[in-house]
């Protein structure tokens, strides 16, 4: 089954469990993907064991905000503050956020690429009460994309006669290759 269909299935299972009140530890703890919830202010209120395995740390309920990961980076390597992550955006805009990829850095320095599925939760009156997020590990796919980018940059560097352009492309190739290697660990 394609990964996005599996992800959507797990998310639907989590949303159904939350809607029926059958939350901890029964349904969500059994899911093999990281799932966590926050209140309307972004404070983490629940996480399953897969979150710890993915993030390399145990989130602190009520203290961690927006995400269960230690640090987040964009795919271009820029630090993404937690208050600007897709989960924060979903709560702020009161809508589901789809289609992004981010890099989680664990406390031990290892990195995992992931696709988040932040989805706001509303009470029966339509008032925002929090959000649920599922993190799908896409490290292998992202490592391959970055390795391919490194190869392209090297080919372009080899084909150009401008020393400065060659240097920039070679540097980009090294950065792409290094990040791909980190994700492949």
Predicted segments, located by residue:
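PAS/PAS-like sensory domains across diverse signaling proteins
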Residues: 41-43, 53
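PAS-family sensory modules
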Residues: 1-33, 92-95, 132-145
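Conserved hydrophobic beta-strand signature of PAS-family and PAS-like sensory domains
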Residues: 35, 44-45
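Sensory-domain boundary capping and coupling elements
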Residues: 116-118, 129-135
């Amino acid at each position: 089954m394609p990964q996005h269909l599996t992800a959507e299935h797990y998310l639907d299972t989590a949303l159904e469990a939350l809607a029926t009140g059958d939350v901890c530890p029964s349904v969500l703890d059994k899911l093999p993907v990281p799932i966590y919830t926050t209140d309307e202010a972004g404070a983490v209120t629940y996480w399953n064991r897969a979150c710890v395995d993915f993030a390399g740390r145990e989130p602190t309920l009520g203290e961690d905000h927006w995400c269960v990961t230690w640090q987040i980076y964009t795919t271009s390597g820029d630090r993404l503050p937690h208050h600007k992550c897709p989960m924060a955006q979903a709560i702020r805009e009161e809508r589901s956020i789809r289609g992004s990829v981010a890099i989680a850095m664990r406390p031990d320095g290892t990195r995992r690429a992931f696709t988040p599925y932040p989805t706001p939760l509303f009470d029966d009156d339509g008032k925002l009460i929090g959000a649920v997020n599922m993190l799908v590990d896409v490290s292998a796919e992202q490592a391959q994309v970055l390795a391919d980018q490194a190869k392209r940059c090297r080919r372009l560097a080899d084909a150009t006669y401008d020393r400065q352009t060659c240097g920039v492309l070679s540097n980009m190739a090294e950065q792409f290759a290094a990040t791909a290697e980190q994700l492949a660990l």
